[in-house]
Amino acid sequence: MNFSKIEALKAELQSRRPLNPSELKRLREEFMIEHTYHSNAIEGNTLTLRETALILQEGVTIAEKPIKDHLDVIGYKDAFEYIISLIAPECPLTESIIRQIHSLVLMDDAANRGIYRSVPVRILGALHEPPQPYLIAPQMEALLRDYTVQKQQMHI
């Protein structure tokens, strides 16, 4: 593989480091808001980007919007902050960590938090077909094995 473009972009990024703390905080917050909004919108959440930002930044409740939509936003924020907390100590990615993230994201769904689904699902309008429930655990194991190998071989 030719990594010259990646190397050039990496060098440009390195030349801008370190980011000042206020800029880093602003970028992280902006990313969290947009990621939370888009991730939840895909799942049918009715909040707008602005409403999502208000919930995350001001802690407000949006009138006439379902409480589930608010909990989805808060759950994504908690999961995002948890993931950020794992970066500095360089915690290895494990099934336990993935389940914990899942548990945070599904804060309003106690019955399904942190566990693999037990029923088949379909995504309307999508070509992708999610795996059958009995395949999820072995596919997660394979994913984590592949991740470990790829991480050791990555060009960083």
Segments (PLM) and residue ranges:
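FIC/Doc superfamily catalytic core
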Residues: 1-156
